Amino acid sequence: REQHPAPPFFHSFLGMSEAAATSPDVSSVLAALQALYHNPDAQAKQQANQALLQFQKTPQAWSTANALLLAQDVPLESRLFSAQTFRSKVTFDLDQLEGASQEQLRDTLLHALDMYATGPRVIQTQLCLALAALALQMSEARWGNVVPGMIERFGGAPSTVGVLLEFLTVLPEEVSMN
């Protein structure tokens, strides 16, 4: 299968430095996710959920989600939260990004789909939903031929056909919801 190299900005998406993986945002998100999924106290879970929902609305959520999505050494729920954050940010906060940053986001999400081509499927689905929502909001000049491009990128190898099918499944759902 054809390898797609990481975009040059992939590790520095939206100005994220190498130190981002140890930033207070990443640490805070990881702590809140730990509380949400593993703390037996219902009030702690509620507070963690509220903190995470508020965090997803911030501009910093773009780079933090990117850092966590790339980190293979963090728990699945952290990477899933990152993929869900991208979906939420694309749906509600895309205006926080200029046109060129939207193209970088597209390339970042495509590269992430390459990384997660063999699973976990729940992350693939969230990334496909984010890409479908992004495709609907980007101009054709910025991202023309969405479906043929996805077929070309993910349709040529058995290991990535599942990603293509997932995208082609969620795209019409996103169209009908928007």
Named regions from a protein language model:
Residues 1-15:
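Short, Lys/Arg-enriched N-terminal segments with co-localized hydrophobic residues
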Residues 13-178:
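Karyopherin-beta/Importin-beta family HEAT-repeat alpha-solenoid scaffold
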